[in-house]
Amino acid sequence: MNNHFKCIGIVGHPRHPTALTTHEMLYRWLCKKGYEVIVEQQIAHELQLKNVKTGTLAEIGQLADLAVVVGGDGNMLGAARTLARYDIKVIGINRGNLGFLTDLDPDNAQQQLADVLEGHYISEKRFLLEAQVCQQDCQKRISTAINEVVLHPGKVAHMIEFEVYIDEIFAFSQRSDGLIISTPTGSTAYSLSAGGPILTPSLDAITLVPMFPHTLSARPLVINSSSTIRLRFSHRRNDLEISCDSQIALPIQEGEDVLIRRCDYHLNLIHPKDYSYFNTLSTKLGWSKKLF
């Protein structure tokens, strides 16, 4: 064992139970190598592990040096929103479909992770968005997002009329099905499907991407990540929501605004030493191949 990482957390709830074999393999391999291992409580229960140290995501964030997320991008997003609050590095083993954020191949995870544990890795700081639904002099409802915050109707699809203010200065108004506010990390997710630009992860920028705007002039807008975005609504309705990473929904009540800004903390995401962002674009999203 080396001094780069001493305590390692195993997290992630895969969609298919067969993927739990990766969790068990990882646990036994790390224990054999002499690491202190904390297993997320639900995983330990499903694997029926005996005499194992377990913890919540928050406890793993407090106690571990590295969290290994086993699953797909959804598992990574769910875990990362909590783990980003703590001084812990995060890496993923892909047991999902796309695996854009989970780099390690499950068939070669031991060798790749062994190199990482020896200190051979690339580190990135990925910022999050904080979304607040609030009314003056009322309690705020707050959530965070790694990928994006999306304004959309609740149950029935319909046009929304809203205004966008950036740093409290009017930017534009719009009639559309909604708005995607994306981080660089999320620029290859829902935002990409809606025609938004790809932002490399190191950019300090936020994109605003209209969803089916009822105009020929609406275009995606890229702003500095230090800006605060305020959404105001012309016709007060009780059926609007914002979604964070398509996992958490906050309803918007009559008279409420939505504030979106960069979080004060960030996710410490790490990759294998041979990681290339543009190679990932090519292999995962079919980005243009070399001609010569």
Swiss-Prot record:
Biological-process GO terms, alphabetical: NAD metabolic process; NADP biosynthetic process
Domain of life: Bacteria
Entries under InterPro entries matching the protein: ATP-NAD_kinase_N, ATP-NAD_kinase_PpnK-typ_C, NAD/diacylglycerol_kinase_sf, NADK
Residues annotated to bind NAD(+): 73-74, 147-148, 158, 175, 177, 188-193, 247
Cofactor: a divalent metal cation
Keyword Iron-sulfur among UniProt keywords: no
Gene Ontology cellular component terms for the protein in this record: cytoplasm
Keywords in alphabetical order: ATP-binding, Cytoplasm, Kinase, NAD, NADP, Nucleotide-binding, Transferase
Reactions that this protein is recorded to catalyse: NAD(+) + ATP = ADP + NADP(+) + H(+)
Enzyme nomenclature, EC number: 2.7.1.23
Predominant subcellular localization, coarse grouping: cytoplasm
Pfam families named among the record's database cross-references: NAD_kinase, NAD_kinase_C
GO molecular function per UniProt: ATP binding; metal ion binding; NAD binding; NAD+ kinase activity
Residues annotated as catalytic: 73
Localization in the cell: Cytoplasm
Residue ranges crossing the lipid bilayer per the database entry: none
NCBIfam families: PRK01231.1, PRK03378.1
HAMAP family, per database record: NAD_kinase
Family assignment from sequence similarity: Belongs to the NAD kinase family.
Function (record text): Involved in the regulation of the intracellular balance of NAD and NADP, and is a key enzyme in the biosynthesis of NADP. Catalyzes specifically the phosphorylation on 2'-hydroxyl of the adenosine moiety of NAD to yield NADP.
Protein name in the entry: NAD kinase
